[in-house]
Amino acid sequence: MKLALFDLDGTLLDGDTDELWCEFLIEAGVLDRADFEARNRSVVVRYRAGTITPAEFCAFYASTLAGRSRQGWAVLRERFVATAIVPRIGAAARALVAQHRDADDRILLTTATNCFLTEPIAAGLGIAEPDLIATELEEAGGVFTGANAGVLNMREGKVTRLASWLEMNGLAGTAIAEATFYSDSANDLPLLRAVGRAVAVDPDARLRREAGQSGWPILELPR
């Protein structure tokens, strides 16, 4: 069994889950436009440029969930996934996942986006919850505090979290050398460099340059 690792945002999804969630909550009147709209744009721009820290990136989006429980967010999350996410995961992306499933590979979704938002997205792709590696959220008394927990699953954190996942699942660290990882972003270069087969999917400019220099295949997915 080999591992097939997929980034979510910009790779399988035509868009960014965190950015879309923030926009969705602003339009729904849950978040104040004056407080969040410009900050959302700024965080996305800095993420793409590679100039924002994982702590700042993840903290901003965790803050959008503060003050409610999982149940308190359930209806909005369901509507968000149905209207903003499902239409943005195209047939080509789903076929790519299916190709690895047909090859009996174990499919993992590894994303900087938090676990609460990505659990139903992974399920919709047929990826079991134990095979989702996402940024964790802090809860107190069953309510999201607006902070993160554990190692953030972004940049070098993706390598750390994958190593922990391998250990928890009784798999040797050498499994990374046989794994395939699909990503669109230079933010994922630490994990792309760690796996045996890196594939750049609709890559940003920095990743496109790296892929060319490293001989990695570049995949343009019809959206």
List each model region and its residues:
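Amphipathic alpha-helical segments within well-ordered protein domains
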Residues: C22-E23, A62, G196
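Metal-dependent phosphoesterase signature
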Residues: E56-A92
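Acidic/polar active-site rim loop that often engages polyanionic ligands
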Residues: D18-W21, F57-C58, A140-A147
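C-terminal cap/substrate-recognition subdomain and adjoining C-terminal extension
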Residues: M1, V75, A82-R223
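Active-site neighborhood of HAD-like aspartate-dependent phosphohydrolases
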Residues: M1-A49
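Electropositive phosphate-/nucleotide-binding environments in soluble metabolic enzymes
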Residues: G15, E37, T51, A55, ...
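Short, compositionally biased "basic patch" segments
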Residues: V44-Q71, L132-L137
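N-terminal alpha-helical segment
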Residues: F36-N40, F57, A175
